[in-house]
Swiss-Prot record:
Compositionally biased region (Polar residues): 1-11
Membrane topology label: Multi-pass membrane protein
Organism of provenance: Cryptococcus neoformans var. neoformans serotype D (strain JEC21 / ATCC MYA-565)
Region called Disordered, residue ranges: 1-21
Family affiliation: Belongs to the TPT transporter family. SLC35D subfamily.
Gene from which the chain derives: GMT2
Organismal lineage: Eukaryota, Fungi, Dikarya, Basidiomycota, Agaricomycotina
Keyword vocabulary terms for this entry: Cytoplasmic vesicle, Endoplasmic reticulum, Golgi apparatus, Membrane, Sugar transport, Transmembrane, Transmembrane helix, Transport
Protein's recorded name: GDP-mannose transporter 2
Length: 420
């Protein structure tokens, strides 16, 4: 049989068209495919087809991103207002309720309080899963062993946070919590190869400045109380006591000591949890369920060992005249923790991470103001200035992290294009 020889004449190839698309090459490819030695052409065709599929997938992904951006821009205001308000209300409510619970006269059973809150939180999450509102992993012993160190760190975080709230005003507590962000950022630099941008560093200076202003205002108020012989805060119970019962140094230092420990514990908790999440693959509700469930026995054991379970201690911590209301507030605070987790996830899902960061930064202002409104914290130039500077530092930090995320995303996109 005579072999097929393609014609050497062909139409003019348009400028920019690959020679692969010419008539001669296509005919040659057909000939190679029909001959025993045409395997190379088949491989070439397969490679080209795979490249086309990859390009189509990248185009679809890019179209999806652009569509999501357009939907987010065109999203009605009423759609985003509700999750933002829910997150803000949950944060304020949780802080105010916890401050109310631990501010009772001579309240010393903090571990028992936290155990009750964790139990209520687990019950609410389990009930929400049963009725189909949320979903998370079932109990697994291997997951529990891997996550137990994280839960132990969480116990330290919530205990030191409660003690800080017991001795510090809400504005001072809220402002000093910003220092945790600095510790976490430099922890990521050391252990995860992160970096701090100049704008992020500027926000850190503002955070430190707001903390110094808040501490100066708080110490000035305490010194003025001491000089006037007015009641001050007892470092053991957190209650107001006469001047003669307490020393000046204890008054000023104990709250800041608890706050410093809380910042260290919070940073360690976040950094260690980041490592463990990679091992366990936990989602938000998984970590919340295991955190609270595993912390219950730890809190209960510490309560039995450290705290006084005598009848006199119970009547002092849970006075009979307000016992029902106090226990209801404790249970409510446990349920509020679930509400915070849900509203946070809702806000991120509907509004995006950027909006959530800005809302979280601005939300420090009403949280700090709630202490002035509900607990009579002093309104003076120092407190107001510290709150405003702290709010600005949070906004600058949110903008810095957003810009950093955009730069990293563009680098990843360029890296993907170069590989393709």
């Amino acid at each position: 049989m005579a072999s097929y020889t393609p014609s050497s004449s062909r139409p003019h190839t348009p400028l920019g068209l690959s020679p692969r698309g010419s008539y001669t090459n296509l005919a040659s490819a057909a000939y190679d495919a029909s001959s025993p030695g045409g395997h190379g052409a088949k491989d070439e065709k397969e490679r080209l087809r795979a490249e086309r599929e990859v390009q189509e997938a990248l185009l679809k992904a890019q179209d999806g991103v652009e569509k999501a951006k357009k939907e987010e821009v065109c999203m009605p205001a009423s759609t985003t207002v509700l999750p933002i308000l829910s997150y803000c209300v949950a944060s304020i409510m949780m802080t105010v309720v916890n401050k109310f619970v631990v501010s009772g006269r001579q309240f010393t059973m903090t571990f028992l309080l936290l155990a009750i809150q964790s139990f209520v939180c687990v019950a609410c999450v389990w009930l929400a899963k049963r009725i189909g509102v949320i979903n998370f992993r079932d109990w697994d012993m291997n997951d529990a062993k891997a996550w137990f160190p994280v839960s132990s760190l969480l116990v330290a975080v919530i205990y030191t946070g409660s003690k800080s709230l017991q001795f510090l005003s809400i504005p001072v507590y809220t402002i000093f919590k910003n220092l945790t962000i600095i510790l976490i950022a430099y922890g990521e630099v050391i252990w995860f190869g992160g970096h701090v941008t100049p704008l992020t560093l500027c926000s850190f200076f503002l955070m430190v400045g707001s903390s110094v202003i808040a501490a100066w205002a708080d110490i000035s108020t305490t010194l003025s109380k001491l000089s006037a012989g007015v009641a001050v805060v007892d470092p053991i119970s957190g209650a107001d006591v006469p001047l003669s019962s307490i020393s000046v140094m204890d008054t000023m230092n104990v709250g800041y000591l608890w706050m410093f420990i809380n910042c260290l514990a919070s940073a360690g908790y976040v950094l260690f949890m980041r490592k463990r999440i990679k091992v366990t693959g936990f989602k938000d509700w998984d970590s919340m369920f295991y955190n609270n469930l595993l912390s219950i026995p730890v809190l209960f054991v510490f309560s039995l060992i450290i705290e006084d379970w005598g009848a006199a201690s119970f009547s002092r911590n849970f006075p009979e005249e307000g016992r029902a209301f106090l226990l209801s507030a404790i249970a409510f605070s446990g349920a509020a923790a679930v509400f915070i987790s849900y509203s946070t996830a809702w806000c991120v899902r509907i509004c995006g991470a950027t909006t959530y960061s800005l809302v979280g930064a601005l939300n420090k202002l009403p949280v700090a103001a709630s202490g002035i409104l509900f607990f009579g914290d002093p309104v003076n130039f120092g407190n107001v200035s510290a709150i405003l500077v702290g709010g600005v530092s949070g906004i600058v930090y949110a903008v810095a992290k957003t810009n950093q995320a955009k730069v990293e995303k563009s680098k990843q996109a360029r890296g993907g294009e170069s590989k393709a």
